[in-house]
Amino acid sequence: KRSRTTRSTSFTRISWACDSLLGDRRSAQPSEHRPLFILGNFRSGTTFLYRTLAKDTENFAAMKTWEIYLAPTRIQRMLYRGILAVDAAFGAPILRALRRFDSEQLGAVEFHKVGLWEAEEDEGLLLYPWAGLFVWFFFPYRHAVRDFIRYDERVTPRLRRRLDRYYAACIEKHLASHPESRYYLAKNPSFCGKVQMLRRLYPNARFVFLQRDPVAQFRSQMSWLAFAWDYFADPMERYPFQRFA
């Protein structure tokens, strides 16, 4: 697993460097964009709103699961689309295998519908530099993500500058890959601790904040985290915190 992960990360790094050869279709600076960011705690209804808006592809460019975890760069997306185009000429065996994996493996995830072609949280992009809340799913220790929960207050200025540039570059690459859409759309529970960062990068950004009854939200969040830790990690107690749900 470690070898496969290393190869995948190396391929992404090389592709990232090669993206500069493609140029940029958009002349606007990041600060001139008007992305829409959906904020809210885990299990507060953000996914439903996000995926509903994401269907309006004329206005919104939302990242899909495959774009986040398999192809965050433009070069990778062009390569995979080319492979699928050739695959289609031979009866699409690769596409069928992907759909089977999507249905049998990702479809088994509870609480939160997951699919390669579903709009998903771009917090997954921060797994590449290992610097986001999703690290918590693999290593469920509070100290592992403590600083990232309160990003604006606790992340050091030096690391913050690096991660800010990285996140803005990911958005630029995504917009360049989707010229049919006008605005970037994203939702993340982690945005609650990154409002200053988002406003700093995108002064013209728009925000939607969702609230849910705290008791119902907390119980749902505990159920989701219990499932996630069982699915991604190997806890001594199969569903930790389930008693709070």
Please name every model-derived segment.
Residues 68-184:
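PAPS-dependent sulfation machinery
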Residues 188, 192, 198, 238-245:
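Anion-recognition interface
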Residues 1-13:
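Charged, amphipathic alpha-helical linker segments immediately N-terminal to NTP-binding catalytic cores
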Residues 17-35:
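N-terminal signal-anchor transmembrane helix
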Residues 219-245:
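PAPS-dependent sulfotransferase catalytic core
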Residues 56-66:
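Post-Walker A helix-loop "phosphate-sensing" segment adjacent to the P-loop in P-loop NTPases
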Residues 37-58:
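Glycine-rich phosphate-binding P-loop
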Residues 198-223:
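Conserved phosphate-donor/acceptor-positioning beta-strand/loop module used by diverse small-molecule
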